[in-house]
Amino acid sequence: MTEFSPREIVSELDRFIVGHPEAKRAVAVALRNRWRRRRVPDDLRDEVTPKNILMIGPTGVGKTEIARRLAKLAQAPFLKVEATKFTEVGYVGRDVDQIVRDLVESAIQMVREKRRAAVRARAEAAAEERILDALTGPGSTAAREAFRRKLRAGELDDKEVELQLADTSSPFGAMDIPGQPGASMGVLNLGDMFGKAFGGRTKTHKTTVSGAWVPLIAEESDKLVDQEALTQEALELAENQGIVFLDEIDKVASRQDRAGADVSREGVQRDLLPLIEGTTVSTKHGPVKTDHILFIASGAFHVAKPSDLLPELQGRLPIRVELKALSRQDMRRILTEPEANLIRQHQALLATEGVTLTFTEDAIDALADAAVAVNGSVENIGARRLQTILEKVLEEVSFTAADRDGETITVDAAYVNGRIGDLAGNADLSKFIL
C-alpha cells in the first residue's frame, strides 16, 4: 500500500492530468485513509469504513484517467469496470459478484509478483541448472562449468534447447458457464479441480536459451512460494485495501420521465447495493468480505441525473465530486503540460522514422481553438477531441514520414488552419470528420 501523503498524491496526479483539484483531493484523501485505517487501534479498525466517492462530470474531462493513474499509485489491488457490462442476476450476462472475483485475481497476481521477486535469486540459480541440464545432460562436470561460463556471458542465447515444463492446462479445456460470457471461473472451477487431479504432467517445449529464462524462473519461483499463504495474503489484501472504480454508473440509472421496463438497469443498481454496503462474496479462493473495499463511481450524467440513481445507492456514495468541462486554456495545457502529452507522443512516433516534428506556440493555440469550436458546435467530448484534430492535422505527415528521413517539419497556425480550418468552421462537415 502506498504511503504517499495526500499532497504528494495530488502532485503525482498533476503530472498527468490537467485541472480538477477537488477530484484529485477527494481520491487522495480516500487513498490516505486506507493507510490511516491500518494504524487505528484494533477495536476501531473494523468500524472505520471507506467513504465511497461519486465523480460527476462530462465525458472526456479525465474521470477515467484519474482512476488509471490512481491504480499505478495505489500499490493495492485495483479494478476498473464499466457498470454497463453487468446485468441483474437471472439475466444473461455477468453479475456484479464478478467484480469481487476479478479484484481477488488482481490481488493474487500482485502478491505472486511480490513473492516471486523475493525468491528470484534462488529461482534464477535453479533455472540456470535446468538450462545446463538441457545443454549438457545431468553429468559431465567439466563440460558443465565451461557451458556455465558461456551461458553467463550470453554466448548461448540463440542455442535451441528442449525443456520439460509443468503443464498447468486442464485436460478438459476451459469450462464456460452457459449464459455468462467470460464467467469460466466461479465458486467451483471444474477445470481447476480436474486439472489438479491430473497433476504432475509435463509438456516438452522447444525454445532458445534466452526464451527459456522467463518460464523457467516463473516455474522455479512458484515451487519456492507457499501457494496457500499467498492466497490468504491476497484475500486479506483485497478485503482491506481493494479499490474498485465503477465507470459509466449513469448508464444504469433509470430516468424518471421514461416509462417502460428498465428491469436490468435498476436490477444492476439493486445488486450493487449490498456489494458497496458490505457483503460476503464466494470466490474459488475463499469468501471475501466487501465491507472495507473502496468504491469510486463515475458518470457523465448527460441524460440521467445523480438523483435518478436509487436513493439507497446515492446514500452509499457519500462524497460527491463535480468535474468541470474543459476550457480553452485547459485544452492548451493538455497538449503541452502532462508528461506523456499528445504532442510529445506524436514527436516520438515520427522520430522513429528520423523526422523531427516541432510545434509553434500559435499552432498549439490553433489546435486548442479548433477543439473548443468543434466541441461547442457538434458534441462536447472533452479532451478526446484533441486526438481527432491532431490526427487530422498530422495525417499527411504520418503517411509520408517514411520517405522524409532527416527532415524537420514545423507545424504552425497556418499549417493547422490549412488542414482543418474549413472543417472546424462547418458544423455539418465537423459532425462526420472531426
Curated annotation (Swiss-Prot):
Nucleotide-binding is among the record's keywords: yes
Alphabetized Gene3D superfamilies for the sequence: 1.10.8.60, P-loop containing nucleotide triphosphate hydrolases
Cellular component per GO, a single term: HslUV protease complex
Subunit description: A double ring-shaped homohexamer of HslV is capped on each side by a ring-shaped HslU homohexamer. The assembly of the HslU/HslV complex is dependent on binding of ATP.
Binding site for ATP: V18, G60, V61, G62, K63, T64, E65, D247, E312, R384
UniProt function note: ATPase subunit of a proteasome-like degradation complex; this subunit has chaperone activity. The binding of ATP and its subsequent hydrolysis by HslU are essential for unfolding of protein substrates subsequently hydrolyzed by HslV. HslU recognizes the N-terminal part of its protein substrates and unfolds these before they are guided to HslV for hydrolysis.
Main location: cytoplasm
CDD domains per the UniProt record, alphabetical: RecA-like_HslU
Organism: Phenylobacterium zucineum (strain HLK1)
GO MF term set: ATP binding; ATP hydrolysis activity; peptidase activity; proteasome-activating activity
Name of the molecule in the record: ATP-dependent protease ATPase subunit HslU
